[in-house]
Amino acid sequence: MSETGKGPDALVEQRGHTLIVTLNRPEARNALSGEMLSIMVEAWDRVDNDPEIRTCILTGAGGYFCSGMDLKGADKKPPGDSFKDGSYDPSKIPGLLKGRRLTKPLIAAVEGPAIAGGTEILQGTDIRVAGESAKFGISEAKWSLYPMGGSAVRLVRQIPYTIACDMLLTGRHITAAEAKEYGLIGYVVPDGTALDKALEIAETINNNGPLAVQAILKTIRETEGMHEDEAFGPDTRNGIPVFLSEDAKEGPRAFKEKRAPNFQMK
């Protein structure tokens, strides 16, 4: 339960074919909690297993995305204690999208700070939208902590090496404009409109052929790190079933008839 009694630490809502996951601890700048991570893991499972869900959006309540670990709460129990006493729970790590990539597109809608764990979660999303006042950073080294959400591995693969090392080793924060320049995010929008833009993008994807979208994303996932020649194998294997589907007939037929296609995921 959120500390202010405003409900669970993360909210899950389905709008049409889109599942919206909202981090809901605004009184703590949406700092991570065990409850929040558990709800996120359940939401990712729901996205993967429910054929009616075609896209997912991750956002935060109260003008904050996520400020990472709750350092104030660390006074009660130092971060390292869970590794010593056996209370560390690895089942919650997939909530951070570390070692867990969804089978459907995940869009981040960022307002305000996305610091430490906030930027770590961001790296597991596919399309990223941020309000112009958003801030990003990996601050763990400042407090002699380690970015356990995977940034020491992922960030250098997603943005230029020297920028990633700068952020990881100095702990400096960057603006939304800088994040877009470096390729960490794709869209900068007026403050307060990130979710609207994310919903617009999700609806565009939802109107596309879901078999094609999911096959494309599967290829992207499977071929990360592969040599190009090796990657063409899964590329072909994932593409052929799409062409053999009924939806592959419906798409061109709808184009010819100048109407919206009615995809059945068959």
Curated annotation (Swiss-Prot):
Region called Disordered, residue ranges? 247-266
Q: Extract the InterPro entries matched here.
A: ClpP/crotonase-like_dom_sf (IPR029045), Enoyl-CoA_hydra/iso (IPR001753), Enoyl-CoA_hydra_C (IPR014748)
Entry EC number(s): 4.2.1.-
Q: Name one Pfam family in it.
A: ECH_1
GO biological process terms on file: cholesterol catabolic process; fatty acid beta-oxidation
Enzyme class, broadest EC rank: lyase
Keyword Membrane belongs to the record: no
Q: Please list the residue ranges that the record marks as compositionally biased, kind Basic and acidic residues.
A: 247-260
Inactivation phenotype:
Not required for growth on rich medium.
Q: Which domain of life is it from?
A: Bacteria
Associated pathway: Steroid metabolism; cholesterol degradation
Q: Which reaction does it catalyse?
A: (22E)-3-oxochola-4,22-dien-24-oyl-CoA + H2O = (22R)-hydroxy-3-oxo-chol-4-ene-24-oyl-CoA
Q: Which residues form the active site?
A: E120, E140
A single MF term (Gene Ontology): lyase activity
* Keywords tagged on the record: Cholesterol metabolism, Lipid metabolism, Lyase, Steroid metabolism, Sterol metabolism
Could you say which protein family the record assigns here? Belongs to the enoyl-CoA hydratase/isomerase family.
Record's subunit section: Homotrimer; substrate probably binds in elongated tunnels between the subunits.
**Described purpose of this protein according to its UniProt entry:** Degradation of the cholesterol side chain involves 3 multistep beta-oxidation cycles, this may be involved in the second cycle. Hydrates 3-OCDO-CoA ((22E)-3-oxo-chol-4,22-dien-24-oyl-CoA) to make 22-HOCO-CoA (22-hydroxy-3-oxo-cholest-4-en-24-oyl-CoA). Not active on (E)-3-OCDS-CoA ((E)-3-oxocholest- 4,24-dien-26-oyl-CoA) or 3-OPDC-CoA (3-oxo-4,17-pregnadiene-20-carboxyl-CoA). Hydrates the same substrate as ChsH3 (AC I7GCU8), but the 2 enzymes make different stereoisomers of the product.
PANTHER family tied to this protein: (7AS)-7A-METHYL-1,5-DIOXO-2,3,5,6,7,7A-HEXAHYDRO-1H-INDENE-CARBOXYL-COA HYDROLASE (PTHR11941:SF169), ENOYL-COA HYDRATASE-RELATED (PTHR11941)
Q: What is this protein called?
A: Enoyl-CoA hydratase EchA19
Name its species: Mycolicibacterium smegmatis (strain ATCC 700084 / mc(2)155) (Mycobacterium smegmatis)
